[in-house]
A protein has these predicted regions:
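Generic secondary-structure boundary signal with a strong preference for alpha-helix termini
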Residues: 37, 54, 65, 102-104, ...
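Flexible glycine/acidic-rich beta-alpha junction loops that bind and position SAM and/or redox cofactors
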Residues: 7-11, 85-101, 132-143, 170-171
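Glycine-rich and small/hydrophobic secondary-structure elements
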Residues: 106-120
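Conserved, mostly hydrophobic/aromatic
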Residues: 1, 48, 89, 134, ...
């Protein structure tokens, strides 16, 4: 079941996202009710999932999300007698799109999740719970490249370069102003 804790998800003084505005997921009360019904109907495998932020560039996101979900797993066990089989931490680990940004350190993130696992799940006799992730952007984005060629140049009050690619090839900048670094392969240092 997908859990939506509601409210605003913050790390320190930074607002990461606003789960309370999302249509996805269940409240804690809805999740407990759903699990009780599933248990009564004979379900044998249970898991939870949550998605609180996207493209976070901090090593604190996953450990904080893990802490919330691990505490919820303990509460599910105590109140419903259900030991979860898995917890899906979803995605959300971001990449450094700008050359001056520090990349996320996946080892540091993993260590943070491991510490929370041992602090919360292991003492509650939930040390067998599998942890899943969805690290598509983190794993693939650094390896995606759009190669395009300048086809013409136009000067008015500014200089414009026409290329043999369009928003169809890379929608994110046109759609919501996302930054993607450009390297001139004829002058990579310029």
């Amino acid at each position: 079941c997908r859990y939506n804790p509601g409210g605003v998800f913050e790390l320190g003084t930074d607002i990461m996202d606003n789960p309370g505005e999302a249509k996805f997921g269940m409240t804690k009360e809805q999740l407990f009710e759903a699990f009780a019904i599933l248990k009564e109907k004979g379900a044998k495998t249970f898991g939870i999932h949550s998605f609180l932020a996207s493209n976070t560039v901090t090593h604190l996101y996953y450990p904080e999300l893990a802490h919330q979900l691990f505490e919820l797993a303990v509460e599910i066990k105590e109140k419903l007698g259900i030991s979860l089989d898995f917890i899906n931490l979803s995605g959300g680990i971001g990449v450094n799109y700008r050359p001056d940004q520090e990349p996320n350190d996946i080892a540091l993130i993993g260590e943070g999740v491991r510490q929370v696992y041992e602090e919360v799940l292991t003492p509650a006799d939930l040390g067998q719970v599998k942890i899943f992730t969805e690290l598509g952007r983190f794993m693939l984005a650094p390896h995606g490249i759009l190669v395009t060629k300048v086809t013409h140049k136009k000067k008015t009050y500014r200089t414009y370069l026409g290329v043999d690619a369009s928003a169809v090839n890379l929608m994110r900048p046109a759609m919501y102003g996302a930054y993607h670094h450009i390297t001139n392969m004829m002058n990579p240092d310029g």
